[in-house]
Amino acid sequence: MKKGIHPEMKLVTVKCACGAEHTFYTTVDNIRIDVCSKCHPFYTSGGKGGVLIVDTEGRVEKFRRKYGDNY
């Protein structure tokens, strides 16, 4: 590898909207994500059909106010 042409890798803590933190090596300083493996429905349902909804912007509540719970 040539010296001086590669970006510097640093250990960064990635924060999810659910509060979970993951640590990665990356060239980016700050990373925030909306969904991770601790809160994504694919990983959290456990095959039992349960669904966990992560709504950081209130879209679900807006939909329920507009159409009600019997959509």
From Swiss-Prot:
- Which cysteine-cysteine pairs are annotated as disulfide bonds in the entry? none
Give me the residues that bind Zn(2+), please: 16, 18, 36, 39
Q: Which GO terms describe its molecular function?
A: metal ion binding; rRNA binding; structural constituent of ribosome
What cofactor does this one take? Zn(2+)
Keywords (alphabetical) are:
Metal-binding, Ribonucleoprotein, Ribosomal protein, RNA-binding, rRNA-binding, Zinc
Presence of keyword Cell membrane: no
Concerning SUPFAM superfamilies, the annotation shows:
L28p-like
Instruction: Name the Gene3D superfamilies for this protein.
Output: Ribosomal protein L31 (4.10.830.30)
Q: Name one GO biological process term.
A: translation
Q: Which family does it belong to?
A: Belongs to the bacterial ribosomal protein bL31 family. Type A subfamily.
- State the function annotated in the UniProt record: Binds the 23S rRNA.
> Its quaternary structure?
Part of the 50S ribosomal subunit.
Protein name, please? Large ribosomal subunit protein bL31
Which species? Thermotoga sp. (strain RQ2)
